[in-house]
Amino acid sequence: MIQLTNRQARQFLLLKHRLLGEYQYIGKQGVLNFIRQAGCIQYDPIDVCGKNAELVLQSRIQGFTKSMLAELLYEDRSLVDFPDKNLAVIPVEDWPYFERYRQAARQHAKRYPEMEALIEQVRAHIQNHGAISSDDLQLDGNFAWQSAIHWSSGNNASRSVLEQMYSTGELIIHHKKGTRKYYDIAGKYIQPNLLNRRSLWRASLSITSGGYCVESALLDLYGIASPTPG
């Protein structure tokens, strides 16, 4: 085991997260490269002096502008919003790593049989009209929904059904207007080789994104995904 002093550990984390020295990433391609090496960046809609994702990138990417992140998410589709740590921005190629989350959401959906008919309505509406937000379709439902994979919950049927379909991976965020999310069918934007690949192994992703992993965190990860044989 490698022994580090507290100072060495601090230096390592600052280097890992690209907070020491000169800029190592430039422009739009630099945004993509940084997020790939970091694993993800958390999205937070609170905007006091800038949203979290924008502040993270501004401090690390030379020449960063907000439009770069929006283009990578909603035009190039090289990145995707994913309900991890509430909402995070991940490289689209990491989609298979989160299949266990989507499986949990599908199992969780069985608690809400009244959603089935409403989900069909959403599918039909998107088929006919394209990407929608919870304001575009008023669904009638009398149930209190709780997400299986993050803190979201509520009694608004339209929002709950869209969030549930988003949690299972059937929908993705097509774009945002301010903090309002618009959803569309994931299969339109994620390549089949990624959309249908089943990878239950997340520990290596979490370790490489954080730069370290303590024993308790690793045990927690093993509760989510077992190591690959051999």
Each PLM stretch: what is its role?
Residues 1-230:
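Long, low-complexity intrinsically disordered regions
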